[in-house]
A protein has these predicted regions:
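NTP-dependent nucleotidyl-transfer catalytic core
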Residues: 1-143
Length: 143
């Protein structure tokens, strides 16, 4: 199986780190609104890679995140560290809590994920479930 390696900018034969075992992580939605057709393209491409790996006999540990906190509006202006949290902004817009907004749009996303017959990741990880690990990772990067 050949894939485009964005690091080397070359089409290369896929070679797993461990024989027939692949870890695959894809970014999932930020659940402050309905997912766009452009977002669905990303998830469909991830599904294509996942199914291709399975077809070629790989055991795939597939993980997708759900961002339910901390996605700031400043990334639209080129500064991801500024602006308002998208979930807080949506909560004000809808007159709900950020938790309610995240739950509603997560359910909508998962329902449509199934309607599109996309392969479910082995693990769905919500950002709020991994804040401690994220802080530790940033600390390591800053060293």
């Amino acid at each position: 199986m050949k894939l485009f390696n964005s690091l080397t900018r070359q089409v290369e034969e896929f070679v797993p780190i461990a024989d027939k075992k692949v870890g695959m992580y894809t970014c999932g939605p930020t659940v402050y609104d309905y997912v766009t057709i452009g977002n669905w393209r990303t998830y469909t491409l991830g599904d294509l890679v996942y199914r291709s790996l399975k077809y070629f006999g790989y055991d795939v540990d597939y993980v997708m995140n759900i961002t339910d906190v901390g996605h700031l509006t400043g990334d639209n202006e080129g500064d991801a560290d500024t602006g308002e949290d998208r979930l807080e902004k949506a909560a004000k817009r809808e007159g709900k809590t950020a938790w309610d907004v995240a739950e509603y749009y997560t359910k909508d996303f998962l329902s449509n994920f199934d309607k599109l017959n996309l392969g479910h990741p082995k693990v769905w990880c919500k950002a709020t479930d991994h804040i401690k690990e994220q802080i530790e990772l940033v600390g390591e990067i800053e060293k």
